[in-house]
Amino acid sequence: MWINQQDLGIDNIFTDDLIYIESWGPKYENRELLKHWFNEWNTRGKVLIWDIKQFFHKDNQTIVEWYFKNKMNTGNFEEFDGISLVVWTKDNKIKELKEFGCNLNNYNPYEESDIPQFRDEKVNWF
């Protein structure tokens, strides 16, 4: 859906009253707002990769680990690893989805000292 920039079934996947929270703060509290966000976002950027690495499912909950990369119309690229916590209804629709992001640019702050040496760089938004 995101890769193709087409709504291929939001109505069939999500409940009317879903709660969808992005890793950096935005919260969409119903399906119509989620559809608006999807359509509006796709005017500003393109998802290049959204690969599922693994998932764990139990009862009505799923945890999904994924890798994400996009290119915005400004020319900026964003990429990060993420996890989604998904809660399902009895009729297999998503009623809650919460994203968490993880920076790909990892390092050991204790590599050269017992005192942490943090990089002087902009911290990602998640």
Each language-model region and where it sits:
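A contiguous, mid-protein "functional segment" used to position or interact
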Residues: 77-108
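Short, surface-exposed coil-to-beta transition loops
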Residues: 48-51, 65, 78-84
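A short hydrophobic beta-strand element
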Residues: 59-68
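A solvent-exposed, acidic/Ser-Thr-rich amphipathic alpha-helical stretch
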Residues: 7-60
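Low-complexity, intrinsically disordered terminal/linker segments enriched in charged
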Residues: 98-126
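Short, low-complexity N-terminal intrinsically disordered segments enriched in polar/charged residues
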Residues: 1-12, 16, 117-126
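Short, cysteine-centered beta-strand-loop-beta hairpins and adjacent loop/turn segments enriched
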Residues: 43-44, 69-79
